[in-house]
Amino acid sequence: MNLASALSLGSEDYGISSRRVLLVDMDPKGNVATTFGVDKRTVGPTMNELFSRGVDSSSLRLEDCTLGPDFLTGSMKASWRKSNPGKSRGPPNHIAVRNLWVLPADMDLSGIEVDLATRVGRENRLKLALSEAMDSFDVIIIDTPASLGLLTVNALCAAEWVLIPIQAEFYALEGMGQLISAVRDVQKSVNPNLGLLGILMTMVQTRSKLCETVTEQARRHFGERVFDSQIPRSVSIAESPLEGAPIVIAQKPNKTNSASRSYWEFAKEADRRISTISEG
């Protein structure tokens, strides 16, 4: 959510140009919409409808399921008012997005793997659903569940690049190994052009020997593919959903909040890699 927000907003301070971004939620928890303060009871068709019948139905289009910048901004401002009932002034001007569209998910998506289990081409459903959006956005970011089920496989089949966040914890590298194995399987069988954009260390604690060890092991295996930027373990990041906005929006692009700054630094790195890929 923070990367998508930062890339869509852009920042002169960090040298990031604004891009048109589509953020796709493939996690049945539906946390993407919640992070932007969206009351999921107010949205129309979601990823579940698009996934289950959109490919087979000309009556349902991608744009019917997406939440645009105005809707997201209104939701964030409404959430801000609920979180700050005693303040006479309204939400700050920086509680807003532009050039960002969200394709939300909800718990109904959790049953899609069973529904699609026997369908031909089940691993390409997302790719087909997103085909009409390829020329409308500069960047499409797909947020996946942690499990390596059919939803994640669909994301890998539709994507050009994979970004892997790793918590700086003991079992992190084991889980990453399983994901890398899945990526290679998809490369061999369905999507040979799938590449690794990078690996992001998250939940990092300063002066933690464990965090240092996990980071060193990641760099030993993946070298420059590990981003220099790291996301710290932070109370402000954990509490940002209470404000109904990602932390890069709630704190706006400044260099005073360390958690917000870490995401902007990461977005700067990711933006450069994306630009290099596009130019290549």
Indicate where each model-derived feature is located.
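P-loop NTP-binding core
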Residues: 1-280
